[in-house]
Amino acid sequence: MSVIVAKINLLMEAGKAVPGPKIASVLGPRGIPVPKFCEAFNKVTSAANANYKVGDLVTVRISIKDDRSHDFTVSGPPVAYLLKQEAKLSKSSGNPGKELVAKLPMSAIIKVAKCKMVDMKVDNEDSAVKMVVGTAKSMGIEVVEG
């Protein structure tokens, strides 16, 4: 039985992984063949999925075992990424709380919360909405009724 010796979290574009320095510098020293990983990742993330589409940033959790085998799980895009897409922003506020960069209606917040409910460890939609509102505030996005 092999034992997990490392766990790695990466943000990668769904369906667009290439064996470049960003991935190779993390996986290469641990003995993971980068081209094979990229091929498997692209195969998994290019399939139709309700939580993300090809090109979206997704969170990848890689478990590396002592026999140099690995497995990975893909979860949807981070909340901050989804909020920036909804608000059509390239970056969030450098000074949140004092500098607002966008306003989002509550309907957009609920949409993001529903999308992320699978990844969040919450029991109900209200808790997920509160978490997304907190992230929005920390990014300098004001939540308005609507």
From Swiss-Prot:
Post-translational modification, as annotated: One or more lysine residues are methylated.
Disulphide bonds in the chain: none
GO molecular function term, any single one: structural constituent of ribosome
> GO cellular component annotations, sorted alphabetically?
large ribosomal subunit
Q: Which CDD domains match?
A: Ribosomal_L11
For this chain's UniProt record, which GO biological process terms are given? translation
Q: Which InterPro entries match?
A: Ribosomal_uL11, Ribosomal_uL11_C, Ribosomal_uL11_C_sf, Ribosomal_uL11_CS, Ribosomal_uL11_N, Ribosomal_uL11_N_sf
Q: Which Gene3D superfamilies match?
A: Ribosomal protein L11, C-terminal domain, Ribosomal protein L11/L12, N-terminal domain
Which controlled-vocabulary keywords does the entry list? Methylation, Ribonucleoprotein, Ribosomal protein, RNA-binding, rRNA-binding
- What does UniProt give as the signal peptide span? none
Q: Which domain of life is it from?
A: Bacteria
Family of the protein in this entry? Belongs to the universal ribosomal protein uL11 family.
The record's subunit annotation is: Part of the ribosomal stalk of the 50S ribosomal subunit. Interacts with L10 and the large rRNA to form the base of the stalk. L10 forms an elongated spine to which L12 dimers bind in a sequential fashion forming a multimeric L10(L12)X complex.
Task: Summarize the protein's role.
Answer: Forms part of the ribosomal stalk which helps the ribosome interact with GTP-bound translation factors.
Name of the protein this chain belongs to: Large ribosomal subunit protein uL11
Look up and give the organism this protein is from: Wolbachia pipientis wMel
